[in-house]
């Protein structure tokens, strides 16, 4: 629907213990561990099956550039969850969800890492990430959500479908994804590919103009 057709004959989710490799993905099969709730089970299956696209079809190097599979896959996982479980992104936090200040779960994790000076930029080798550092999931997902809002969802989906068609069953690198963007939008995407994916620079918003309209300020 948003990326491209599933080309394999089947998709199978197998239950297994964490010690036996639960939470791992392979083309056409994913291994799922124990989950307490139906929603969280659906979320895990969605994420792991999503890896059939990232990196089972779009076969990026998940060690050198993990955001191309974990980051993009997490973005689409978030879109799925928002579509089928709207306004419930913080359910996994239990009672703590009352104190999140409106942040979604992934945003909250990233904000915590950033405020603690523990955040890392997504486009680096997986060996460089600290233990259980989920920036490559949460920060990357948030950045591609920003790209979706910047381009508009229809344009974003159109570009990602172009990426899929150009690189399915091949080995894309970040420069290949950037090239697809540059060829399919006139908007400047340097902020994504050369700042927020590759450095720890923070967004610096400013007001460019103020416009009065009736009794409102735009």
Language-model regions, residue ranges each:
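Hydrophobic alpha-helical and helix-loop surface patches within well-folded domains
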Residues: 1-218
């Amino acid at each position: 629907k948003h990326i491209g057709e599933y080309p394999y004959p089947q998709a199978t989710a197998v239950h297994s213990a964490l010690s036996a490799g639960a939470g791992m993905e392979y083309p056409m099969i994913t291994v799922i561990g124990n989950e307490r709730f139906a929603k969280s089970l659906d979320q895990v299956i969605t994420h792991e099956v999503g890896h059939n696209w990232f990196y089972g079809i779009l076969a990026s190097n998940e060690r050198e550039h993990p955001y191309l599979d974990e980051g993009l896959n997490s973005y689409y996982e978030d879109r799925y969850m928002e579509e089928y479980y709207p306004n419930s992104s913080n359910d996994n936090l239990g009672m703590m969800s009352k104190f999140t200040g409106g942040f979604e779960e992934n945003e909250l994790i990233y904000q915590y890492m950033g405020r603690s000076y523990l955040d890392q930029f997504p486009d680096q080798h997986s060996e460089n990430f600290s233990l259980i550092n989920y920036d490559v999931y949460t920060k990357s997902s948030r950045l591609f959500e920003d790209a979706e809002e910047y381009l508009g969802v229809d344009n974003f989906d159109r570009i990602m479908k172009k990426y899929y068609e150009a690189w399915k069953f091949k080995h894309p690198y970040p420069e290949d994804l950037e090239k697809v963007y540059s060829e399919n939008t006139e908007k400047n995407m340097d902020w994504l590919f050369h700042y927020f994916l590759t450095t720890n620079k923070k967004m610096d918003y400013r007001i460019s103009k103020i416009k009065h309209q009736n009794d409102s300020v735009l």
